[in-house]
């Protein structure tokens, strides 16, 4: 019963600098440096702004910038995901991602970055009564092989749309764990 998995929001951040040759970095605004600083600095949102007792993670999974090792590009594009188990943590982390990206660009003397947050699936909440009834049926059918997963996971699932619509729900996996 309760939270089964996490929310999942996507983000794209495009840092815009001023490209140039690697031999003259002083006449550029390096978006790769901004991207690197953001990747490191955004982790402080998790460690210093999010309640330590709440789940939340920000992952940068893609970085695209430049075409050669001796050329500072004009832009650096980051793509990532923000995951949490509750709306307050989700909101705080989205705010932190946006604020950190803007601050990094400001420190570099660059224009504000282009930030796109894409709302994804909400967390799935299992109905307590339905979970108890269904759990008893699964236990009767599978005996000791039926296991309750005690902690919610970090995966996401659009099944949450049923829950958000008010449908009493119980989400479970069958054969999803090693025997």
Question: Where in this protein do the model-derived segments appear?
Answer:
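Short, low-order "capping/linker" segments at domain edges
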Residues: 124-137
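Generic structural marker for isolated residues within well-ordered, non-membrane alpha-helices
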Residues: 101, 135, 159
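Short, structured loop/turn "capping" segments at alpha-beta junctions
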Residues: 111, 144-145
């Amino acid at each position: 019963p309760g939270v089964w998995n996490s929310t999942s929001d996507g983000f794209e951040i495009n840092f815009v600098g001023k490209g140039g040759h690697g031999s003259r970095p002083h006449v550029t605004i390096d978006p790769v440096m901004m991207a690197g600083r953001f990747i490191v600095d955004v982790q402080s949102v998790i460690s210093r702004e999010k309640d330590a007792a709440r789940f939340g993670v920000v992952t940068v999974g893609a970085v695209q910038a430049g075409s050669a090792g001796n050329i500072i590009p004009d832009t650096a594009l980051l793509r990532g995901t923000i995951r949490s188990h509750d709306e307050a943590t989700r909101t705080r982390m989205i705010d932190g991602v946006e604020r950190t990206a803007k601050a990094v660009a400001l420190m570099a003397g660059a224009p504000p970055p282009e930030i796109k947050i894409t709302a994804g699936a909400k967390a799935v909440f299992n109905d307590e009564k339905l979970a108890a009834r269904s759990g008893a049926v699964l236990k009767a059918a599978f005996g000791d092989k039926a296991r309750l997963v005690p902690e919610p996971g970090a995966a996401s699932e659009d099944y949450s749309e049923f829950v958000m619509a008010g449908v009493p729900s119980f989400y479970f996996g069958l054969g999803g764990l090693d025997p």
